[in-house]
């Protein structure tokens, strides 16, 4: 076994709710232990600043304030935990168009490395996109390590319910995640993003707590039937989504009551998950939920009603579903440091397993 490294990863997702930070100790292959974690929420003002730059590319104007905000909030989040040997910094995804302009995560690892005085791994997605991959999702290699850490030995699936849903099907009996039969991963469709946007725009609230409002609404079946014909659901896997890929469809919720709009968005998210599970190479023995969306009971109930396998939170196998993404970027940071692959043909569509990312501050 290589020397163990204690790393802290951070994730600011497309839901724009805050920064998760989490510590992990690993050699880049096996997980030795999980450490402390913390959540640093964005204020309403922070949310507004970031919302205004969604969709922008690096060469566009008006990013300076948001970039400074991302650096400051991540620094504050990192400092909520004890100092680590290495930091993983994903940045804030503003735009994702892997077959066109590429992918844009706001933030500079060099700035954080200077302020932390420790190496920072960042820019995890660009190399994958440059080599023909989707650049997403990147958590699957970590999910594979988690399944082995939990002692699983049959194919299962992990579903991250963030702004967008991401499914990872995995076979933990394989020796390494880059093996062809070990993983299949792709985005399922919208998840929390439209729900949170509806709550923010209509009520000025960040989330529909436990999906309470959604449970009082009625799904619009005609709208849902039409949305199911979106070209994304007919694309080959692996594939990935931008946060706003379904913005034209979701704009049709504007004239509905809030409960009905939420219920319809929940129904659409659940359909995307069910359609994704059907594409798994072998039916998963269980679907494990992580991410903020697993707290939305309306969404979880809708998913349970549409998939054939048992659905459980990842806490059922000893994991922290709120921190899995942050833990993933701590784990991936160590893999980048060691030159190990972080994506493969069956996770992003890249031509061969590759180690992406850049490392700032190696001289510290």
Pin down the residues of each PLM region.
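Conserved non-catalytic scaffold segment of RNase H-like nuclease domains
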Residues: 33-69
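Conserved ATP-utilizing enzyme core subdomain
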Residues: 14, 18-32, 39-42, 176-270, ...
């Amino acid at each position: 076994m290589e020397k163990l490294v204690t790393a802290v990863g951070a994730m600011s997702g497309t839901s724009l709710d805050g920064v998760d930070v989490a510590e992990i100790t690993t050699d880049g292959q096996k997980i030795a232990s999980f450490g402390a974690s913390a959540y640093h929420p964005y204020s309403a003002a922070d949310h507004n600043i970031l919302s205004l730059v969604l969709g922008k590319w690096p060469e566009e104007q008006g990013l300076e304030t948001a970039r400074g905000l991302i650096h400051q909030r991540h620094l504050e989040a990192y400092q909520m935990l004890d100092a680590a040997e290495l930091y993983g910094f994903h940045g804030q995804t503003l735009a994702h168009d892997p077959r066109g302009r590429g992918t844009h995560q706001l933030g500079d690892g060099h700035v954080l490395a200077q302020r932390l005085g420790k190496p920072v791994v960042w820019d995890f997605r660009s190399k994958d996109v440059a080599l023909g991959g989707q650049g997403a999702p990147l958590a699957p290699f970590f999910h594979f390590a988690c399944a082995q850490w939990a002692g699983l030995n049959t194919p299962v699936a992990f579903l991250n319910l963030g702004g967008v849903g991401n499914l990872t099907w995995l076979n933990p009996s394989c020796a390494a995640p880059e093996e062809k039969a070990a993983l299949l991963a792709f985005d399922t469709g919208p998840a929390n993003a439209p729900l949170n946007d509806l709550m923010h725009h209509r009520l000025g609230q960040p989330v529909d707590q436990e999906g309470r409002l959604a449970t009082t609404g009625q799904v619009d079946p005609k709208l849902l039937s039409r949305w199911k014909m979106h070209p994304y659901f007919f694309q080959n896997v692996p594939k990935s989504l931008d946060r706003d890929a379904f913005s034209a469809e979701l704009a049709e919720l504007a004239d509905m009551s809030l409960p009905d709009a939420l219920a319809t968005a929940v129904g659409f998210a659940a359909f995307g998950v069910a359609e994704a599970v059907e594409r798994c190479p072998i039916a998963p023995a269980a679907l494990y939920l992580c991410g903020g969306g697993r707290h939305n009971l309306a969404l979880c109930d809708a998913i349970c009603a549409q998939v054939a396998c048992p659905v459980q939170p990842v806490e059922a196998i000893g994991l922290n579903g709120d921190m899995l993404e942050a833990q993933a970027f701590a784990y991936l940071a160590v893999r980048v440091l060691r030159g190990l692959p972080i994506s493969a043909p069956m996770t992003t569509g890249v031509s061969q397993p590759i180690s992406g990312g850049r490392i700032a501050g190696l001289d510290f």
